[in-house]
From Swiss-Prot:
Function: The natural substrate for this enzyme may be peptidyl-tRNAs which drop off the ribosome during protein synthesis.
Keywords, sorted A to Z: Hydrolase
Family listed: Belongs to the PTH2 family.
InterPro entries (alphabetical): Pep_tRNA_hydro_II_dom_sf (IPR023476), PTH2 (IPR002833)
Domain of life: Eukaryota
Protein name per the record: Probable peptidyl-tRNA hydrolase 2
Catalytic activity: an N-acyl-L-alpha-aminoacyl-tRNA + H2O = an N-acyl-L-amino acid + a tRNA + H(+)
Molecular function as annotated in GO: peptidyl-tRNA hydrolase activity
Keyword Hydrolase carried by entry: yes
UniProt EC number: 3.1.1.29
Keyword Transit peptide: no
Source species: Drosophila melanogaster (Fruit fly)
GO CC list: cytosol; mitochondrial outer membrane
Lineage: Eukaryota, Metazoa, Ecdysozoa, Arthropoda, Hexapoda
Pfam families: PTH2 (PF01981)
Length: 186
């Protein structure tokens, strides 16, 4: 064993590690505060047209954070009257889930993290008409829930610009159930 327990290079390396941790930690805190202040300032739903593969509409708000022990989910409302094939339904639901996720990343990141920590639950339910789909969308927006309406491009099975899927959430399961709880599973 040597005379010294720590030589100067070990001390300098230790200080450098602690300094880099401190700087990174402070940066993360500031960045998290900035994102949270953006979402906390939103009082009304946003609405936006988007050109995700099939095209979509969206609206969101901070509603749906729930409590710490709440379950979170996303519900995909599929139009059953269009008689889409299984693959087409899967693709349209994928567009809806991705669209809703992208909007939640920007507008409700804390809620999104809660949903991710609960396993990213997604439930597919059905409606029998466009009118019923739009009524669900209107109620979800009234409840200030994140929504993403998918319109088909019309390249395969169904007519162009058909409203195929509505994604609601992610949000607290209880909040979503108030809007979609009466619908039957797909």
């Amino acid at each position: 064993m040597g005379d010294k327990l720590l030589d100067p290079t070990q001390i300098i390396n230790g200080l450098a590690v602690m300094l880099s941790f401190f700087v990174g930690y402070r940066y993360a805190l500031k960045r998290g505060d900035a994102k949270d202040s953006v979402t906390e300032g939103a009082a009304t739903p946003f609405s936006q047209e988007s050109s995700v593969s099939s095209g979509s509409e969206a609206s969101v708000s901070d509603k749906g954070y729930g409590g710490l022990n709440d379950n979170f989910k996303m519900v995909l409302v599929v139009r059953n009257d269009l008689k889409m094939g299984k693959g087409k339904i899967a693709a349209q639901c994928g567009h809806g889930a991705v669209g809703a996720y992208q909007r939640a990343v920007v507008r409700t990141p804390r809620l999104l993290r809660s949903w991710e920590n609960c396993g990213c639950a997604k439930i597919a339910v059905r409606v029998e008409s466009e009118a019923e789909l739009m009524a669900i969308k209107k109620e979800a927006e009234r409840q200030q829930l994140n929504t993403c309406l998918i319109r088909d491009a019309g390249r395969t099975q169904i007519e162009a610009n058909s409203k195929t899927v509505l994604a609601v959430g992610p949000a607290a399961a209880a909040d979503i159930d108030r809007v979609t709880g009466h619908l039957k599973l797909l």
